[in-house]
Amino acid sequence: MARPRSLVSPLLSGVFCQCDTVGGAPHTHDTPASPSLAAALAADPCGGLVCGGPEHETRLQILFQELDVNKDGGICINDLAVGLKRLGVHRTELELRKIVKAGDKDQDGQLDFEEFVHYLRDHEKKLRLVFKSLDKKNDGRIDAQEIMQSLRDLGVNISEQQAEKILKSMDKNGTMTIDWNEWRDYHLLHPAENIPEIILYWKHSTIFDVGENLLVPDEFTVEEKQTGMWWRHLVAGGGAGAVSRTCTAPLDRLKVLMQVHASRSNNMSMLGGFTQMIREGGIRSLWRGNGINVIKIAPESAIKFMAYEQMKRIIGSDQETLGIHERLVAGSLAGVIAQSSIYPMEVLKTRMALRKTGQYQGMLDCGKKILLKEGVSAFYKGYVPNMLGIIPYAGIDLAVYETLKNAWLQRYATSSADPGVFVLLACGTISSTCGQLASYPLALVRTRMQAEASVEGAPQMTMSKLFKHIVKTEGAFGLYRGLAPNFMKVIPAVSISYVVYENLKLTLGVQSR
């Protein structure tokens, strides 16, 4: 059988030191390196990448000159794209931007020689940590079983055949195992730190904000927690959610109006609903309730994250990440805790969305009037159906997403586990839609209970009585009032969230994808 051809040219693999950096001590050299290289390697004389000897510095300089296409003493994104292509290495524009951004210390848009060496050294250290985490047997080699086990720990199930396909893409000598040099050579000048990051390609709860923050939280590795990347992910996700919710707020308010006011006798259409809102309060009225909807993102995300981590400890898992069923249990309990903590804000959001012009001066005035007129209990109306809706929403969303993810990995992932933006958005959209469809009747009952006191002549009912009343007077279809605008906002919400999330990650220095 023909041996797989290396994806790295001899020039690229030749810049590396062949020291046993995983298990042994690095070489030392009598000949000192130049000042620029010495500065780059001061913290780690060998670094596993360059020993500091003249032959290695020469190879680095040759590689740098090869990538410096326009010969201006710096490697920009265009230089990197053209130079790597000449060497037989293909990277996406996003990957190239991340490489330059990660190494560009003076932020001039390009890498000089010292920055180039710094980037390679730092990246090599990350690759070494990942290699060690994958090498379960601690024998200096990675086999298919170790790949499968590592991904299983991260919630990604692949077959042995699939693991072997991934293995073959990196195995240069046909042994069906990967040693340190093969692993490092394959990932040279690639911004990801790689196979365990398959799970990062598939993280979606912080990316896809469709306005219903009931998703199971993402898993963060020990390294992400230690380096502070976890809070950067949360901030990026919160910012993405704020922009996404603001852009789709008119559809969200229309959904609330249709849930509360639409009936057989008042068959409100989408066009009629928008016309009614604009006629009553002008264009700005389309965004009523959006302020509180955005504000509640921060406390809810923070509480959910802390509660999720605590639930993991209570469950007692000794794994760094949980299995699917454990994630569902821990995520659902964390969702209950977070929703219980911020539920009064949910009631305020509904009341603000339903308010008439001049009814309230703002969120605080709304809260004050509800408290004086209806008492504290008003802030927890609809609490029970809201809590009951968490499990079907989160469970179905997670199950559908995991099913689609693993189906894609089994069928299409060969040398790369990166699904691409389209697959990510499609999986997130489909899973979120299924979750909402299952929990929508509970969401509608919750909204009507929250709005009862603000609707003239509306009866005060318990959850079960309201269910029976809706089915009796409107039929089963009545439990799905407002579903059309709710589904219409999913695709734009997911798309906007993803774009903003990716840009905020780069701004915050998150280089995990």
Curated annotation (Swiss-Prot):
It is found in: Mitochondrion inner membrane. It is a multi-pass membrane protein. Residues 1-233, 309-331, 402-424, 502-513 are mitochondrial intermembrane. The keyword Disulfide bond does not apply. The chain crosses the membrane at residues 234-251, 289-308, 332-345, 382-401, 425-442, 482-501. GO terms for cellular component: mitochondrial inner membrane. One of its GO terms (molecular function) is calcium ion binding. Keywords: Calcium, Membrane, Metal-binding, Mitochondrion, Mitochondrion inner membrane, Repeat, Transmembrane, Transmembrane helix, Transport. Solcar repeats lie at residues 228-314, 322-407, 419-507. Its main location: mitochondrion. One of its GO terms (biological process) is transmembrane transport. Ca(2+) 1 binds at residues 68, 70, 72, 79. Residues 252-288, 346-381, 443-481 are mitochondrial matrix. Belongs to the mitochondrial carrier (TC 2.A.29) family. This is Calcium-binding mitochondrial carrier protein SCaMC-2.
